[in-house]
Amino acid sequence: VTQEPQLLEKRNTYENIAFALEVMGTPNDEIESKTNTLLDLVELNENAFKYPDQLSGGEQTRVSIARSLANNPLVLLCDEPTGNLDPELSIQIVSLLEKINRAGTTVVMATHDSSIVNRRKKRVIELANGKIARDESEGSYILR
């Protein structure tokens, strides 16, 4: 999941999610079932047939998350998924990622937003100059 959702412009929300399953050769009935389940998870059922340019930034991020989950990854990598979102939408996206984590998927998120780190009290690994500068099981963000 990237800071700028890389959605397929000529495909609607449903098709953007289903695409990840199509390229893996998933049977059509399974594509339909899984895509609908993912639309439920990210709360985009009402936007299933909207195109990326008809979605807000937060909605686009949720499509990107759903598409990333389509093939049941063990780990979900998120690079600044809230970077271009307002604080309220950021909270919604982080809450969705926490829900995904509680369901069993490891979520690794890079962020510069100290409020996200401090509010969640999750494991924090700080990188400086390409090396681990800190690794705390329930750390908080410290400005240095």
Label for each model-derived stretch:
Residues 30-42:
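ABC nucleotide-binding domain "signature" region
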Residues 51-55, 59:
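Conserved ABC ATPase signature
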Residues 65:
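Hydrophobic anchor residue at the start of the ABC signature
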Residues 70-74:
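A short, proline-enriched helix->beta-strand linker immediately N-terminal to the Walker B motif
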Residues 76-79:
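Catalytic Walker B motif of ABC-type/P-loop ATPase nucleotide-binding domains
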Residues 87-89:
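Helix N-cap at the start of a conserved alpha-helix in ABC-type nucleotide-binding domains
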